[in-house]
């Protein structure tokens, strides 16, 4: 096996990267009918596995879970989750041969072993599903030619897939068919029915490709979604402590600040987030964001280049083979940081507006990171719709995990692949921010309100125009029109 993307010629690579079509709601008029009466077996019962399965069952589909024998014998967490929710659970040999659609929702690093174990058991002409294409694109897994290979990738953690479905809604979703494995031409019909069963069609579905999903997903999670939040949390907390702020206050401002700030981002993009600031603070946040972009532009491009070339996956898979030595080392180091061990501050009251007023630097980091990630993806050939979902859209969902249990929770919820990429980015970004940005800060940038200053109307007009006319704001306004039912995400109520 070898990296699938690297076997394609340039024309094919550009074609796959540029696959992105926003599907009309009418295209889902048949709902789940294509999969009605067919046996669907999910491998793995983690967050995505369980919650997708619950939604699909509630949509009228026949769902069972295939687990490894030891998971069943030892009654591990995956077995307990599936059993307690009333699903049929069995070993691979028992369930896989009966399945019309096998969905592999195990962690990325297990995919090759899982596919090797189950492919001989999959019946002729059945389908194999993924929710992330790393195994196909980066590992280069070759699937039997009679098997249809599809992907349905909800753009949020598994818990949110379930919560939005229970509200009668769904989460934005990417679907794709692997061009090397669509022998009967049924791949798109399978993917559409699967997406409808999870509720994704109610929030907007992009018809994409395995390649575009993988390359954009890796870029988003490494940079703005996880890496920037981790680097920003560590640097901002250390700055607050250096300025003599109460550790409990500093910890709470950072822990809940990302969530509060990005809630505005979710509802109205960067424009609304910046509008939550006073005019003086907005001008300062804009200036800081431009400084941050200048200092981190090379790092965003390096991550994108390493993702496109396959270098990132090569290095990560070397770490897999080495027992996750680097991943575990970086995870341990994160657990020992000052921010992670800050007092909880349960008795400290911070109003919603105070998170903005005292978090101007954090707002600037969000703006810079979102725009850099989006721009870098688009420059690489990824369509704006995909770049939006993999940067701005998912950010409030990840910020919500930090609000629950800080960086520990974020790194538990995201995949090992995302966690590894997060550390690669944050370990470089944090020292740059500490050296190049923190010394330039002024009173009111972090931990206290920006002093009121005389406002130049022309400057304010130009800054507002620059914010609102950025391409991510234009495509975001269009895509958010499909998500008018979005609920507020908040750990604080």
Swiss-Prot record:
Domain KARI N-terminal Rossmann: 14-208
Protein name, per record: Ketol-acid reductoisomerase (NADP(+))
Family: Belongs to the ketol-acid reductoisomerase family.
Described function: Involved in the biosynthesis of branched-chain amino acids (BCAA). Catalyzes an alkyl-migration followed by a ketol-acid reduction of (S)-2-acetolactate (S2AL) to yield (R)-2,3-dihydroxy-isovalerate. In the isomerase reaction, S2AL is rearranged via a Mg-dependent methyl migration to produce 3-hydroxy-3-methyl-2-ketobutyrate (HMKB). In the reductase reaction, this 2-ketoacid undergoes a metal-dependent reduction by NADPH to yield (R)-2,3-dihydroxy-isovalerate.
Enzyme Commission identifier(s): 1.1.1.86
Reactions catalysed according to its record: (2R)-2,3-dihydroxy-3-methylbutanoate + NADP(+) = (2S)-2-acetolactate + NADPH + H(+); (2R,3R)-2,3-dihydroxy-3-methylpentanoate + NADP(+) = (S)-2-ethyl-2-hydroxy-3-oxobutanoate + NADPH + H(+)
Residues bound to substrate: 415
UniProt keyword list: Amino-acid biosynthesis, Branched-chain amino acid biosynthesis, Magnesium, Metal-binding, NADP, Oxidoreductase, Repeat
Native source organism of the sequence: Histophilus somni (strain 129Pt)
GO cellular component: cytosol
Top EC class of this enzyme: oxidoreductase
NCBIfam families in the record: ilvC, PRK05225.1
Pathway(s) this gene product operates in, as recorded in its UniProt entry: Amino-acid biosynthesis; L-isoleucine biosynthesis; L-isoleucine from 2-oxobutanoate: step 2/4; Amino-acid biosynthesis; L-valine biosynthesis; L-valine from pyruvate: step 2/4
Domain KARI C-terminal knotted span(s) in chain numbering: 209-345, 346-486
GO biological process terms held by the UniProt record: isoleucine biosynthetic process; L-valine biosynthetic process
SUPFAM superfamilies attached to this UniProt entry: 6-phosphogluconate dehydrogenase C-terminal domain-like, NAD(P)-binding Rossmann-fold domains
Active site: residue positions: 132
Chain positions recorded as Mg(2+) 2 binding sites: 217, 390, 394
Entry-linked PANTHER family: KETOL-ACID REDUCTOISOMERASE, MITOCHONDRIAL
């Amino acid at each position: 096996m070898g990296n699938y993307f690297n076997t394609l010629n340039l024309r094919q690579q550009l074609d796959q990267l540029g696959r992105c079509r926003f599907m009309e709601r009418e295209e889902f008029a048949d709902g789940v009918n294509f999969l009605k009466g067919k046996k669907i077996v999910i491998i793995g019962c983690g967050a995505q596995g369980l919650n997708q399965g619950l939604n699909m069952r509630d949509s009228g589909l026949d769902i069972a879970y295939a687990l490894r024998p030891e998971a069943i014998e030892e009654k591990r967490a995956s077995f307990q989750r599936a059993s307690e929710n009333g699903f049929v659970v069995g070993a691979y040999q028992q369930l896989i041969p009966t399945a019309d659609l096998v969905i592999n929702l195990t962690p990325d690093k297990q995919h090759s072993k899982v596919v090797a174990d189950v492919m001989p058991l999959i019946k002729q002409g059945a389908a194999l599903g993924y929710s992330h294409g790393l195994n196909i694109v980066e590992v280069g897994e070759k699937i039997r030619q009679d098997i249809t290979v599809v992907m349905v990738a909800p753009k949020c953690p598994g818990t949110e897939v379930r919560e939005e479905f229970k509200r009668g809604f769904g989460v934005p979703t990417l679907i794709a068919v692997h061009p090397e494995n669509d022998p009967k031409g049924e791949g798109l019909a399978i993917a559409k029915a699967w997406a409808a069963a999870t509720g994704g069609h109610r929030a907007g579905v992009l018809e994409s490709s395995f390649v575009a999903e993988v390359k954009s997903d890796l870029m988003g999670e490494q940079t703005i979604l996880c890496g920037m939040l981790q680097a920003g949390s560590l640097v901002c907390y250390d700055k607050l402590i250096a300025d003599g702020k109460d550790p409990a206050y500093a910890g709470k401002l950072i822990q809940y600040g990302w969530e509060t700030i990005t809630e505005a981002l979710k509802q109205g993009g960067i424009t609304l987030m910046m509008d939550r600031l006073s005019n003086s603070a907005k001008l300062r946040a804009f200036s800081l964001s431009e400084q941050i972009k200048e200092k981190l532009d090379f790092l965003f491009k390096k991550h994108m280049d390493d993702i496109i070339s396959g270098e990132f996956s090569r290095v990560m898979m070397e770490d897999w083979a080495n027992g996750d030595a680097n991943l575990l080392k970086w995870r341990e180091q994160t657990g020992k940081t000052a921010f992670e061990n800050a007092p909880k501050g349960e008795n400290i009251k911070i109003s919603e507006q105070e998170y903005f007023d005292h978090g101007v630097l954090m707002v600037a980091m969000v703006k810079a990171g979102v725009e850099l990630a989006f721009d870098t993806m688009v420059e690489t050939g990824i369509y704006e719709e995909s770049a939006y979902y993999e940067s701005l859209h998912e950010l409030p969902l990840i910020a919500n995990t930090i609000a629950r249990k800080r960086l520990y929770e974020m790194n538990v919820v995201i995949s090992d692949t995302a966690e590894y990429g997060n550390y690669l980015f944050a370990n470089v970004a944090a020292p740059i921010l500490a050296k190049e940005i923190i010394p330039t800060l002024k009173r009111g940038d972090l931990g206290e309100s920006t002093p009121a200053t005389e406002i130049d109307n022309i400057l304010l007009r130009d800054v507002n125009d620059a914010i609102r006319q950025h391409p991510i704001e234009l495509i975001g306004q269009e895509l958010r029109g499909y998500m008018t039912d979005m609920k507020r995400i908040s750990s604080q109520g």
